[in-house]
UniProtKB/Swiss-Prot annotation:
Pfam families, per database record: Bac_DNA_binding
Region annotation (Disordered) ranges: 51-71
Name of encoding gene: ihfA
GO terms for biological process, alphabetical: DNA recombination; positive regulation of metabolic process; regulation of DNA-templated transcription; regulation of translation
Protein name: Integration host factor subunit alpha
PANTHER family hit by this protein: DNA-BINDING PROTEIN HU, INTEGRATION HOST FACTOR SUBUNIT ALPHA
Domain of life of the native organism: Bacteria
GO terms, molecular function: DNA binding; structural constituent of chromatin
Family, similarity comment: Belongs to the bacterial histone-like protein family.
One GO cellular component term noted in the UniProt record for this chain: cytosol
Task performed by this protein: This protein is one of the two subunits of integration host factor, a specific DNA-binding protein that functions in genetic recombination as well as in transcriptional and translational control.
Amino acid sequence: MALTKADLAENLFEKLGFSKRDAKDTVEVFFEEIRKALENGEQVKLSGFGNFDLRDKNERPGRNPKTGEDIPITARRVVTFRPGQKLKARVENLK
């Protein structure tokens, strides 16, 4: 099961006593701030959680899996996430 933005808002409502509207707005603002920072080329560092970075990927050769035809994969910018040590440690101990 995946954790959704609606789940995050529900947790804020239940655990912190936010109104449902405020909880939803808080989650939306949080993710909008991350989006804006990345759109402006900034790194996003969430202490104890991890970092979101932008990485430029060069053009590279690819292949159409149906036809086998060689096609170029265009250069692009991608978002990467590197988990922090605390998050890694907690996840590694789960089984």
